[in-house]
C-alpha cells in the first residue's frame, strides 16, 4: 500500500500539486506555527463543507413528483453517494423537498413542519406545481408556489421533473451551502 502525498488547496485557488510549490506552503505554515503557536483558518468553510456533504432531506411528497423523488433515492441514481440520506422526521432533517401540488389546506402543515426543522435549513421546490401551481394554477384551492409559504433555495423545473433534474438540484444546493460564509443563515 502506497502513501499518497496530500494536495494543498490555497483559499480561492487551484490545487497545488506535490512538489516545490507545495513545500513552500507547508514551510510557511510550519514557520507560522513556530512563531505564533497556532494557525489561523476559516472555520466557516470547514463547517459548510461538512454540511454540504451530509444533507438529510425530509420528503414532503404531495403528488406525482414524489415518485421521481423516490426514484432518485433508488439504485440507479443513489443520492446516498452524495451524503444525502432521507429522514422521516423534520427534527432530523435540514433540507425539505416539496414535491407536488400544495393546496390551501396543506399549506399550514407545510409551514408547521418547516418550523420544526433545526437551523440551518434549506428548501428545494420540485416540479411545476410546487414552483408556481402548475397545471392547477387557476384552481381556487391551490397555492401558487410553495415560496409563498416557506423560503425556497432551489427550484427544480418540470412536470414531473426527472430524477436527474432533482439530482442536479441537490448538487446546486451543495454548491450554494459551500459558498455561504456564515455558520448560521
Curated annotation (Swiss-Prot):
The gene is nuoB. Its main location: membrane. It is a peripheral membrane protein. NDH-1 shuttles electrons from NADH, via FMN and iron-sulfur (Fe-S) centers, to quinones in the respiratory chain. Couples the redox reaction to proton translocation (for every two electrons transferred, four hydrogen ions are translocated across the cytoplasmic membrane), and thus conserves the redox energy in a proton gradient. One of its GO terms (biological process) is aerobic respiration. [4Fe-4S] cluster binds at residues 64-65, 129, 159. This is NADH-quinone oxidoreductase subunit B. Keywords: 4Fe-4S, Cell inner membrane, Cell membrane, Iron, Iron-sulfur, Membrane, Metal-binding, NAD, Quinone, Translocase, Transport, Ubiquinone. PROSITE patterns: COMPLEX1_20K. Its EC number is 7.1.1.-. InterPro entries: NADH_UbQ_OxRdtase-like_20kDa, NADH_UQ_OxRdtase_20Kd_su. NDH-1 is composed of 14 different subunits. Subunits NuoB, C, D, E, F, and G constitute the peripheral sector of the complex. It holds the Pfam family Oxidored_q6. Binds 1 [4Fe-4S] cluster. NCBIfam families: nuoB_fam (TIGR01957), PRK06411.1 (NF005012). It is found in: Cell inner membrane. GO terms for cellular component: plasma membrane; respiratory chain complex I. It is an enzyme of class 7 (translocase).
